[in-house]
Curated annotation (Swiss-Prot):
Gene: abhd13
Sequence intervals crossing the membrane: 30-50
Active-site residues per Swiss-Prot or TrEMBL entry: S193, D268, H298
Disulfide bond annotation, renumbered to this chain: none
Sample GO molecular function, one term: palmitoyl-(protein) hydrolase activity
Name of this chain's protein: Protein ABHD13
GO cellular component terms given for this protein: membrane
Length: 337
């Protein structure tokens, strides 16, 4: 009579062998970990600390860049223009954010053929604070002016971010293009400081919808600004992925072949004026100008003598050349004002 085949014996022996091997491996691994921590624990701890600080700084970058609450009432009160035709409009971005716009209407001679300026402001306050500047644009340039509050600013919803601001600019341009009472061939972008980066990016993505661009006291990029403001720390060696907000205007300006005006206040104590000159030099536009105001500060260059004369000359001469730019051969002359 055959003996019954028993599986348990070999299986038990196999399990015991595996357990014994695993225990030995665990002891060796534990010893290796102890030795590694003893030898390199300081480096590991330093790495963890640096990683934590990097994460905090990455999240903290928005606080250093966006100031929608300055002045303190900026999120509660948006001054409206008085005594002039205007519309207070709300639009939606593609990601569903509700934005607040002010449209200042030019009602002088031939209003249907007037240019329309899309005004992108800096990193603080709201569109109401820019109304006095925008009214002077309307009067001197005989143009409609559309001011938009980015997400998280003024009465607009959401929180500011680089991609969010780009979407806000696109939504504003889309809205203007839907209006039958606006000449779609004469849409001009204007941006000051951070708004200059937004305007340059919008122009680079919409070369056939933007007739011209004007930027004032803006920067090459946020990494360039970080290297300038924090010169005591080797910020220039940080890779781009360390920056949550980049605003790489020195790259975005390269596709912008439409007529371009670069406005630089040489008394700007925040953004080095040399950055405006570098953006001007990077621009491939055959019809570009660099308007220089020696007494112009970061926020108040528009109050300098001759400021609106420079803008008016640009609007009259260079905007007309936009229609011929596709067929004109050679390089147009460049004027430095």
């Amino acid at each position: 009579m055959e003996k019954p085949w028993r599986l348990w014996g070999p299986l038990e022996a196999c399990l015991l062998s595996v357990c014994a091997w695993s225990w030995g491996f665990c002891r060796v691994s534990l010893l290796a970990l102890i030795l590694t921590f003893h030898l390199y624990g300081g480096f590991v701890l330093l790495g963890l600390i640096l990683a934590s600080l990097a994460g905090i700084l990455y999240k903290f970058q928005d606080v250093l860049l966006y100031f929608p609450d300055q002045p303190s009432s900026s999120r509660l009160y948006v001054p409206m223009p008085t005594g002039i035709p205007h519309e207070n409009v709300y639009i939606r971005t593609k990601d569903g954010i509700r934005l607040n716009l002010i449209l200042l209407r030019y009602t002088g001679e031939n209003p249907a053929g007037a240019p329309t300026i899309l005004y992108f402001h800096g990193n603080a306050g709201n569109i109401g604070h820019r109304v006095p500047n925008a009214l002077l644009m309307l009067v001197n340039l005989k143009a409609n002016v559309v001011l938009v509050d980015y997400r998280g600013y003024g009465k607009s919803e959401g929180d500011p971010s680089e991609d969010g601001l780009y979407q806000d600019a696109e939504a504003t341009l889309d809205y203007v293009m839907t209006r039958p009472d606006i000449d779609k061939t004469k849409v001009v972008l204007f941006g000051r400081s951070l708004g200059g980066a937004v305007a340059i990016r919008l122009a680079s993505c919409n070369p056939h919808r933007v007739a011209a661009i004007m930027v004032e006291n803006t920067f090459l990029s946020i990494p360039h600004m970080a290297a300038t403001l924090f010169s005591f720390f080797p910020m220039r060696y940080l890779p781009l992925w360390c920056y949550k907000n980049k605003f790489l205007s020195y790259r975005h300006v390269v596709p912008c072949r439409m007529p371009s005006l670069f406005i630089s206040g040489l008394s700007d104590q925040l953004i080095p004026p040399v950055m405006m000159k570098q953006l001007y030099e990077l621009s491939p536009s055959r019809t570009k100008r660099l308007a220089i105001f020696p007494e112009g500060t970061h926020n108040d260059t528009w109050q300098c003598q001759g400021y609106f004369s420079a803008l008016e000359q640009f609007m009259k001469e260079l905007l007309k050349s936009h229609a011929r730019e596709e067929t004109t051969q050679g390089t147009a002359s460049v004027t430095i004002i």
